């Protein structure tokens, strides 16, 4: 890729049907972890018009009212009226959970290469990424895509724009010059709305009340605004589209700025490295950038089911490193325990903290529960690198 280019990322609101599913899955996970922190959970959710289906594999001693958890999550999101696409009071909730396969459990409970440590819950590859485009060390396009739909939700909830509805999508296209964000080329924002509001009113309010307060003014030079470009967005949420857990994995991570290993996060307990190792890889990458070892850092880790130690830990800094990528990778392996049990202890992951992650991005948010966003290893890495 040349140093001058356009790059686009998107986000969706908490009311998007796939995000409704993600939040229900993580609400189920949290409810279980609150009672049984060693539970094995793989909770999947489907939501459609008037229907929620809960399925997957759960092994736990917890006693959870899964139907009530689903209804409360839908209520919190704001779907309390059938006109919005689904109503928490009247929707049907079907529960079809099974237990974790004993074949999987035996490999996770006792690692084949280290009997003192938990084996990975599956094979797979995971990526973490950080860059210095924003103070949160996230790529500019995905960071601001999240903030746009987050503000849409805020204005809906506090009543400033009472005609807003829960479902919304954003997309930010950024012009890069010399490899750095230079200006916002295009913003797309589509929001579900009440039927009696005009397109002109929607456009003005979205631009003035949502977009301009969020995006840095100096980046809005010749920006194109596309607001509800179909002209109407009344039918939304699970009525407009069927929602499924795990269908927004690029929204959840880096907006396409980094590769993705393919494994979704929501509904999975920390023994699933799809989730825990991706969080750890973000933690590593963010600390590398915070330490000043590189302006950009991509970390890949991979695992085999039942084996504790990662097969590889690979660092790529895209030519921005102060020391070689190989030396950074060696420092990472020295200062971060990337075995599944080590990750859980390092990041304190056996907590009911996951529903909050399921909308507006798992990364780049300074939430107190998000231990993987800490930069507490930066000084250690910098000293070890001799900088």
UniProtKB/Swiss-Prot annotation:
Q: Which compartments is it annotated to reside in?
A: Cytoplasm
Name of the protein in question: S-adenosylmethionine synthase
Pathway the protein contributes to? Amino-acid biosynthesis; S-adenosyl-L-methionine biosynthesis; S-adenosyl-L-methionine from L-methionine: step 1/1
- The residues the record assigns to binding Mg(2+) are 18
In its keyword annotation, does this UniProt entry include Phosphoprotein? no
Reaction equation(s) it catalyzes: L-methionine + ATP + H2O = S-adenosyl-L-methionine + phosphate + diphosphate
| Any one GO BP annotation for this protein | one-carbon metabolic process
User: Region annotation Flexible loop: residue ranges?
Assistant: 100-110
Q: How does it assemble?
A: Homotetramer; dimer of dimers.
Q: Which organism is it from?
A: Cupriavidus metallidurans (strain ATCC 43123 / DSM 2839 / NBRC 102507 / CH34) (Ralstonia metallidurans)
Which gene specifies this protein's sequence?
metK
Q: What InterPro entries does the entry give?
A: ADOMET_SYNTHASE_CS (IPR022631), S-AdoMet_synt_C (IPR022630), S-AdoMet_synt_central (IPR022629), S-AdoMet_synt_N (IPR022628), S-AdoMet_synthetase (IPR002133), S-AdoMet_synthetase_sfam (IPR022636)
């Amino acid at each position: 890729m040349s140093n001058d280019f356009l790059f686009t990322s998107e986000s969706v609101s908490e009311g998007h049907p796939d995000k409704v599913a993600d939040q229900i899955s993580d609400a189920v996970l949290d409810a279980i972890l609150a009672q049984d922190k060693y539970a094995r959970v793989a909770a999947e959710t489907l939501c459609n018009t008037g229907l929620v289906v809960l399925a997957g594999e759960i092994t736990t001693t917890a006693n959870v009212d899964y139907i009530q958890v689903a209804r409360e999550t839908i209520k919190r999101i704001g779907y309390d009226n059938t006109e919005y696409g689904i109503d928490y009071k009247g929707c049907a909730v079907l529960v079809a959970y099974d237990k974790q396969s004993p074949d999987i459990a035996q490999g996770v409970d006792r690692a084949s290469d280290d009997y003192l440590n938990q084996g990975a819950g599956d094979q797979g590859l995971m990526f973490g990424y950080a860059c210095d485009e924003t103070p949160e060390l996230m790529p500019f396009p995905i960071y601001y895509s999240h903030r746009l739909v987050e503000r849409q939700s805020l204005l809906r909830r506090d009543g400033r724009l009472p005609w807003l509805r829960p479902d919304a999508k954003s997309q930010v296209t950024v012009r890069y010059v010399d490899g750095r964000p230079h200006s916002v080329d295009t913003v797309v924002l589509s929001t579900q709305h009440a039927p009696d509001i005009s397109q002109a009113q929607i456009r003005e309010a979205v631009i003035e009340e949502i977009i301009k307060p969020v995006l840095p003014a100096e980046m809005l030079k010749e920006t194109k605004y596309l607001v509800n470009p179909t002209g109407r967005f009344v039918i939304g949420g699970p009525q407009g589209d069927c929602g499924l857990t795990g269908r927004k994995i690029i929204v959840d991570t880096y907006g396409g700025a980094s590769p993705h290993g393919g494994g979704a996060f929501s509904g999975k307990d920390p023994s699933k490295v799809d989730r825990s190792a991706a969080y750890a890889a973000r933690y590593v990458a963010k600390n590398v950038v915070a330490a000043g070892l590189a302006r950009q850092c991509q970390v890949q880790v991979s695992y085999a089911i039942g084996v504790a130690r990662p097969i590889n830990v690979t660092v790529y800094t895209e030519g921005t490193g102060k020391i070689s990528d190989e030396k950074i990778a060696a420092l990472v392996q020295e200062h971060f325990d990337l075995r599944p049990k080590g990750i859980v202890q390092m990041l304190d992951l056996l907590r009911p903290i996951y529903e909050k992650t399921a909308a507006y991005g798992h990364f780049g948010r300074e939430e107190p529960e998000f231990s993987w966003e800490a930069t507490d290893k930066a000084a250690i890495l910098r000293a070890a690198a001799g900088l």
